[in-house]
């Protein structure tokens, strides 16, 4: 905490010639807080960044992601919907909102519609493909989910895709394959919270 306070003080002490410099200083501080896992403080500070450029969808998207990390799913949803209202083809917002709904197990048909719309704009994106697989799993379409998630993982060996693919395999009774995928995920990032939570919830030990 002492080092964090020191680093924040250094950022704040940097000279700023105008509004753009001031915003960049705030963004540097937000990034520092994010890296230290101080998501609530990062979210609050990002709100100040957004207030300086409220029409900047990328800044609002960053605030939405921090709202999610800070445990504010409704606020995340509000921010993402505000982006989509302004820019309906902002596929990152469509995907993030669809995935959030799917992950919480709410409004699953809307989640699927949002993710399919995101895929129209970015059909090769493995993370959006992952979201589609996850919503299909939540809808109970496990075999379809498996095929989609295998495609996503083939495109991108990502730890969170591994967590989802492993869970679908586990639910289908393919436990050895699930454990193998999770081991791959742990090799990519053994500290990932999504994978750790999945393993704990399922009582699995790769």
Segment roles from a protein language model:
Residues 1-206:
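Alpha-solenoid helical repeat scaffolds
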């Amino acid at each position: 905490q002492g080092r964090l306070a020191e680093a924040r003080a250094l950022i704040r002490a940097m000279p700023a010639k105008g509004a753009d410099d001031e915003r960049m200083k705030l963004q540097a501080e937000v990034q520092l807080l994010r890296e230290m896992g101080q998501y609530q403080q990062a979210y609050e500070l990002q709100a100040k960044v957004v207030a300086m450029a409220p029409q900047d969808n990328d800044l609002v998207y960053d605030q939405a992601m921090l709202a999610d990390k800070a445990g504010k799913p409704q606020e995340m949803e509000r921010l993402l919907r505000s982006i989509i209202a302004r820019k309906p083809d902002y596929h990152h917002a469509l995907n993030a909102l669809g995935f959030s709904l799917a992950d919480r197990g709410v409004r699953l048909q809307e989640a699927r519609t949002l993710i399919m719309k995101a895929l129209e704009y970015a059909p090769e994106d493995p993370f959006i493909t992952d979201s589609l697989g996850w919503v299909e799993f939540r809808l109970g379409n496990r075999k379809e989910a498996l095929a989609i998630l295998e495609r996503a993982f083939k495109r991108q060996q990502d730890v969170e895709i591994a967590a989802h693919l492993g869970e679908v395999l586990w639910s289908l009774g393919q436990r050895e394959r699930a454990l193998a995928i999770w081991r791959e995920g742990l090799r990519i990032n053994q500290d990932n919270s999504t994978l750790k939570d999945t393993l704990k919830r399922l009582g699995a030990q790769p």
